[in-house]
Amino acid sequence: MFDIGFSELALIAVVALVVLGPERLPKAARFAGLWVRRARMQWDSVKQELERELEAEELKRSLQDVQASLREAEGQLRNTQQQVEDGARGLHDQARELHDEVGRDIDIRTSATPLAAPLELQADAPVVLEPGSAQPHTPVPAPAPVVAQAQPMAPAPKQTLVPAPHGSLTSTQVTTHAPTASATASSTSPQEKTP
């Protein structure tokens, strides 16, 4: 502590013996030892307190470093969360646009297709020609009442419009045309006619 060697201690002991004398020297030595012990204890306590303060300061610095890294990580997480939310919002907007586009396409297609079947007439509906028009007028049947349960219906026979020989349109049943006897007779060759 004081860097005092053996020769210096011997010199101090000789000076103390001469100054104090042999009677008071043991009492003075105890007193000096007590003060040296107290000084060492004070020095050790100050040293320990400085070390504790340095450790506390070091802990504070490390705590501040950890807090700074936590803030940085929190900022990165918020940025990542914001990016994910922006991406999700973008995907949601794209999905909504696709849904709207598909809905518009469906609306366009349904408005482009006719609602009634063209040129199909019901079996019991008479065809009426109005004077001065070439189009037949078919009365529109009243809508059928809504039934609580759906019942299967037999399909109605299909009718097509066939021009009559005198130029007006009439309704006839669709049938397969079988060749008539006169048509087959005229189409056979003279060699086949001989029995």
From Swiss-Prot:
Give the transmembrane ranges: 1-21
- Record has Signal as a keyword: no
- Its recorded name reads Sec-independent protein translocase protein TatB
Positions of the region Disordered?
130-195
User: What keywords are assigned to this protein?
Assistant: Cell inner membrane, Cell membrane, Membrane, Protein transport, Translocation, Transmembrane, Transmembrane helix, Transport
A Pfam family the protein falls into: TatA_B_E
What's the family? Belongs to the TatB family.
Q: How does it sit in the membrane?
A: Single-pass membrane protein
HAMAP family assigned: TatB
Q: Where in the cell is it found?
A: Cell inner membrane
Has UniProt tagged this entry with the keyword Membrane?
Answer: yes
Q: Which organism is it from?
A: Xanthomonas campestris pv. campestris (strain ATCC 33913 / DSM 3586 / NCPPB 528 / LMG 568 / P 25)
Q: Which domain of life is it from?
A: Bacteria
Stretches with biased composition (Low complexity):
145-157, 175-195
Q: How does it assemble?
A: The Tat system comprises two distinct complexes: a TatABC complex, containing multiple copies of TatA, TatB and TatC subunits, and a separate TatA complex, containing only TatA subunits. Substrates initially bind to the TatABC complex, which probably triggers association of the separate TatA complex to form the active translocon.
Q: Which GO terms describe its biological process?
A: protein transport by the Tat complex
Among the GO molecular function terms of this UniProt record, one is: protein transmembrane transporter activity
Q: Source gene?
A: tatB
Record function comment: Part of the twin-arginine translocation (Tat) system that transports large folded proteins containing a characteristic twin-arginine motif in their signal peptide across membranes. Together with TatC, TatB is part of a receptor directly interacting with Tat signal peptides. TatB may form an oligomeric binding site that transiently accommodates folded Tat precursor proteins before their translocation.
**GO CC annotations, alphabetized:** TAT protein transport complex
Q: Which InterPro entries match?
A: TatA/B/E, TatB
